[in-house]
């Protein structure tokens, strides 16, 4: 029996308050309005940014259905939707691409002017309303996606059709973590063959930076982390050296400068700490180095830096979603994965049923997982 045009009752993980566990609730998901798409979720990754929302360091209105790194199948579409049809495999996009605004038309940027849910989260779709309700009350959306639900509704500028043969429990990582890291290397920094790179932080995103540096042909990839247990995986994915700052008495940037004849060509901060952002900047060569901020810093914090750190020729950059224009890039990234141009499987350390979402967050907080994928 078709569910198109009808309210769907399903299970979702609802966060009612900050610092509290998710609760699995019976919710109602309204049909998509014009230019909206309702998706039956198949798999979703658990990302550190979701945990930032739980802790309150990343503001989002509550109660909400979180999750932003998922993949699923289109259940129904609203009036005017032409980019997907029911039955298509898709990835929701937390960084939309309208294709019409000034930024979408700019060749060097990817932050669509409709990305208000990232910069000024309202917890709603573009029309300002929610499609979720629970116990008779509206439930907020989360950055255009809300993948912690058996069904979700997104705007049609926030969804990408992908290869019908793609394994959704793998390519869901392309919805955030992998693309953010990989793109920071190949799209934002534009790592060059034979170059030297330093990657600060070896979580799922940091390891994806390592994959990007290797794919781009870097000759030396130095992985930096205080957890030595992460070094084996980093080397498996392409790191040539692994160092722990706690093993040295001098600042880590000085260690890296000595290892690389004055500094690396490219450095990446994938932790979200202000002190390591400065260390990453100073670890790249003062005359030609490029440093990329990848990690999301805590809200309402600012960074001070000596202008001389930049005046001689360093470049300091940052980007959301690896600098990729989402609707254009996601199908290509999925195709590249299918063509075995890069791996995703080594990033997935745990696969759990959706109902065990709180266990997945426990693994994340304990540093015991790289990526946990929840399946519906």
Swiss-Prot record:
Binding positions (Zn(2+) 1): 47, 68, 176
Protein name (record): Alcohol dehydrogenase 1
Binding of NAD(+), residues: 201-206, 225, 230, 294-296, 371
Domain of life: Eukaryota
Enzyme class: oxidoreductase
Family annotation (PANTHER family): ALCOHOL DEHYDROGENASE, ALCOHOL DEHYDROGENASE 1A
Alphabetical keyword list: Acetylation, Cytoplasm, Metal-binding, NAD, Oxidoreductase, Zinc
Catalytic activity: a primary alcohol + NAD(+) = an aldehyde + NADH + H(+); a secondary alcohol + NAD(+) = a ketone + NADH + H(+)
GO molecular function: alcohol dehydrogenase (NAD+) activity; all-trans-retinol dehydrogenase (NAD+) activity; identical protein binding; zinc ion binding
Organism annotation: Rattus norvegicus (Rat)
Gene: Adh1
Subunit structure: Dimer of identical or non-identical chains of three types (A, B, C), which are coded by 3 separate genes at different loci.
Names of required cofactors: Zn(2+)
Gene Ontology terms describing biological process: animal organ regeneration; behavioral response to ethanol; ethanol catabolic process; lipid metabolic process; response to ethanol; response to progesterone; response to retinoic acid; response to steroid hormone
